[in-house]
């Protein structure tokens, strides 16, 4: 009563294939795979210390901080 058997899942899969078609399902799976890949890449990049990043990224952060401070000053 609690969980579904393999036959229930096969029927659900068949209905999903009939409703959406294989082309939409493969493109959706491809999009999901690329999203997971980008997420993992972002997590790896986040783990790198700032010393390993190039000078360009540090200068962009400094200019962004200066602009933020300029935007917060009262006029």
Curated annotation (Swiss-Prot):
The gene is tatA. The keyword Lyase does not apply. Residues 40-75 are annotated as: Disordered. The keyword Oxidoreductase does not apply. Keywords: Cell inner membrane, Cell membrane, Membrane, Protein transport, Translocation, Transmembrane, Transmembrane helix, Transport. It comes from the Bacteria. The chain crosses the membrane at residues 1-21. Belongs to the TatA/E family. PANTHER family: SEC-INDEPENDENT PROTEIN TRANSLOCASE PROTEIN TATA. It is found in: Cell inner membrane. GO terms for biological process: protein transport by the Tat complex. Pfam families: TatA_B_E. One of its GO terms (cellular component) is TAT protein transport complex. Gene3D superfamilies: 1.20.5.3310. This is Sec-independent protein translocase protein TatA. Part of the twin-arginine translocation (Tat) system that transports large folded proteins containing a characteristic twin-arginine motif in their signal peptide across membranes. TatA could form the protein-conducting channel of the Tat system. Signal peptide: none annotated. It is a single-pass membrane protein. GO terms for molecular function: protein transmembrane transporter activity. The Tat system comprises two distinct complexes: a TatABC complex, containing multiple copies of TatA, TatB and TatC subunits, and a separate TatA complex, containing only TatA subunits. Substrates initially bind to the TatABC complex, which probably triggers association of the separate TatA complex to form the active translocon. InterPro entries: TatA/B/E (IPR003369), TatA/E (IPR006312). Coiled coil: none annotated.
């Amino acid at each position: 009563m609690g969980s579904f058997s393999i036959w229930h899942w096969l029927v659900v899969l068949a209905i999903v294939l009939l409703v959406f078609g294989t082309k939409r399902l493969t493109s959706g799976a491809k999009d999901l795979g690329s999203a997971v890949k980008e997420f993992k890449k972002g997590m790896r990049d986040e783990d790198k210390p700032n010393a390993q990043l190039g000078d360009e990224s540090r200068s962009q952060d400094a200019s962004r901080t200066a602009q933020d401070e300029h935007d917060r000053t009262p006029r």
